[in-house]
Amino acid sequence: TAGVVDRDSDGLTIHGAKMLATGGVVANEVFVTCIQPLQPGDARFALSFAIPMNAKGLKILSRKSYEANAPSEFDNPLSHRFDENDAVLFFDNVHVPWDRVFIDQDVEMCQKQFHATPAHVYQNYQAQLRLMVKMKFLVGLGHKITETNGTTNFPQVRETLGQLAAQGAMVEAMVQAM
């Protein structure tokens, strides 16, 4: 895992790897932190900082896209459109200036940033948007399936479609309220 290997008056030097969630391959900046519980002695991994994706020594390895295995939109409607590329960041002695460092080797503060503040909610905003769009897609897909099957007017089917639509609208309202 990525950790501090050196420090000076200008900032930290980070070396190691860090798993990066969806969207990193198209980001201009990356927020690097630790959400996993750390053990005593893990202070060098208790970090929180932001850096540009083109920082010297920073490399990104993205997994192969699922789209390559789903060339037909008709045959693969989900994987053709909704691929999410997770990636790994490799820090090869990357310098992080002090003005980009939020937490430096403070295990307690590293955990509090997510469990004592709304930071985790805001950090996951992109995930909420992504899931909202998928929910809307699934509502539409469910309706299309019932049309194809000729079951749209069955009372129990209408009830289920109504519940799905209500849940989709509720998710969208909560995302917009953020």
Located regions from the model:
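FAD-binding core of flavoproteins
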Residues: 1-130
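Extended amphipathic alpha-helical segments enriched in small hydrophobics
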Residues: 126-178
